[in-house]
């Protein structure tokens, strides 16, 4: 089973396209929607929904993945639920990048203070990061320097921030999921 979390643009047709692409490596792909506007509520909602679909599945190696803000949540929710994660162009600091887009971006700071200390060290090897050199939203060299000591990073040469086409990374995801 693969759980897919959308980014800030929850209505993008690219979300459906990514779900279809993910079905090439696992026919059980679950799309979990969340508001993107209320971080504390989103965290509770995602924990509940992801736990529920994990319990419903008999897959011994479920995987959670997301793009942008969905990558942020995939890492945290996947860690808390004990499943592997794949992040595409993750938004690592939504407390900064979401300012002006949502009412209370400071809720992300509060979430960070409640997270397990050094959770990335404890999550070592459980997350695969795919970063685009053409991300027009984030400087992925900074993202890489923050994550490379904990996770393997794959660089993509052509995709934009929303990562419309993930098919070239499906084999790496499948191998990561099943190891």
Curated annotation (Swiss-Prot):
Disulfide bonds: none annotated. Gene3D superfamilies: alpha/beta hydrolase (3.40.50.1820). Belongs to the UPF0227 family. NCBIfam families: PRK04940.1. PANTHER family: ESTERASE YQIA-RELATED, UPF0227 PROTEIN YCFP. This is UPF0227 protein VP0969.
